[in-house]
């Protein structure tokens, strides 16, 4: 009997947990189902059901401004089930794949199974990943998809380093959340490093750096990486032209000009928004109540300081130095647009925008605990997971009933 690979088992457990918590309830904010229906009819504008669906009124028609990858993933299901397609179910599956990929990354980094289980549990429940997947709304499934494909890109970079596949996963990530495009220079850097120096663990299932790297020049992966990204860029410009009549994407800027929280001119990314974003990410607390349930997470969120303190494990990562530096740079690059944006992710539990850079921090956490897992790390992960589960319970009990 063939033994199930641990990464697949981790993915199945994550799917089961997320499905159990979400009850696979369809989200009313199924913008990607509407977009998939539109694409199947050969158009970019959606049949707008009403104001509860965020869509940009442009030229008398309504358009989804979010990155479209989840809609493309839904195409075969929408072709069969139409408007009844359950967008939340896709979010649940993507969360499972993200956790499975994380487990595989942990193996390639040389983690013990017990340490890997703790880190993967943190990725699912200790961040906003579980909450986003359980609800499955248009904004939330985008985060889940971005985490999923970012983890897959990191797995490939820690393995065979096929440039075209890294580019494909990276494109899927930034076509889920646009901010993920900021990680591309880091991926390119890791592709150009000599393979035997870039893979942290050379003992993992025969994937030794030496055997895979012999005879391969450092430029070959980068060429295929660039070719795939170039093709994606052409398709992206065509999609923009179909929506806006221009090759560039003006969706978010136009939305910002129409939004009550925005401004009639200028960019949605400004240094003037930095103080509020930093307060949101690191200070904002839930409101204390006199009675049950004692705490109320406001719609504006709760800082990762209180929801995901186990992220501090990332600062312990020391080697391999190229990976440590690359992952920190990726996290910082991806964080920049999020800390300059005009809104902090409202409505949410925790700080959902942190999911854009948390995959890189989770990878750093893995490197940090390869040799020794500090006892306080277990405590912080357990706390983070309990807070994440509590957040799911609160929202499904009091908000999304």
Which stretches of residues belong to each language-model region?
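Long, distal/terminal scaffolding or interaction modules
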Residues: 200-201
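Membrane-proximal envelope and lipid/glycan-remodeling enzymes
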Residues: 1-197, 206, 212-401
């Amino acid at each position: 009997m063939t033994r199930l690979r641990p990464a697949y088992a981790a993915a199945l457990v994550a799917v089961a947990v997320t499905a159990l918590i979400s009850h696979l309830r369809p989200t009313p904010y199924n913008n990607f189902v509407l977009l998939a229906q539109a694409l199947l009819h050969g158009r970019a504008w959606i049949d707008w059901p009403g104001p509860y669906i965020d869509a940009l009124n442009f030229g008398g028609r309504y358009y989804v401004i979010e990155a479209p990858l989840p809609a493309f993933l839904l195409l075969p299901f929408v072709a069969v089930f139409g408007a009844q397609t359950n967008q939340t179910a896709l979010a649940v599956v993507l969360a499972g794949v993200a956790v499975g990929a994380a487990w595989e990354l942990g193996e390639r980094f040389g983690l013990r199974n017990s340490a890997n289980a703790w880190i993967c549990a943190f990725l699912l429940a200790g961040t906003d990943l579980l909450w986003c997947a359980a609800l499955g709304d248009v904004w939330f499934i985008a985060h889940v998809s971005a985490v999923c494909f970012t983890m897959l890109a990191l797995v490939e970079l820690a393995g065979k380093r096929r440039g075209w596949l890294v580019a494909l996963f990276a494109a899927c990530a930034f076509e889920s959340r646009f901010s993920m495009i900021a990680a591309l220079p880091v991926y390119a850097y890791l592709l150009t490093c000599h393979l035997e120096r870039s893979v942290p663990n050379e003992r993992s299932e025969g994937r030794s750096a030496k055997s895979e790297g012999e005879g391969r020049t450092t430029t070959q992966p980068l060429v295929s990486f660039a070719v795939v990204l170039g093709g994606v860029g052409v398709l992206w410009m065509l999609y923009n032209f179909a929506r806006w009549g221009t090759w560039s994407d003006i969706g978010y800027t136009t939305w910002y000009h129409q939004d009550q929280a925005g401004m009639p001119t200028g960019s949605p990314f400004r240094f003037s928004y930095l103080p509020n974003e930093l307060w949101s990410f690191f200070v904002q607390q839930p409101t204390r109540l006199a009675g049950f349930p004692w705490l109320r997470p406001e719609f504006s969120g709760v800082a990762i300081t209180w929801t995901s303190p186990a992220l501090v494990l990332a600062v312990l990562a020391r080697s391999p130095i190229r990976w440590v530096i690359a992952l920190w740079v990726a996290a910082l690059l991806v964080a920049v647009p999020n800390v300059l944006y005009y809104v902090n992710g409202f409505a949410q539990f925790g700080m959902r925008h942190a999911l854009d850079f948390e995959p890189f921090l989770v990878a750093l956490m893995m490197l940090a605990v390869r040799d020794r897992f500090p006892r306080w790390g277990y405590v912080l992960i357990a706390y983070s997971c309990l807070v994440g589960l509590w957040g799911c319970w609160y929202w499904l009990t009091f908000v999304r009933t």
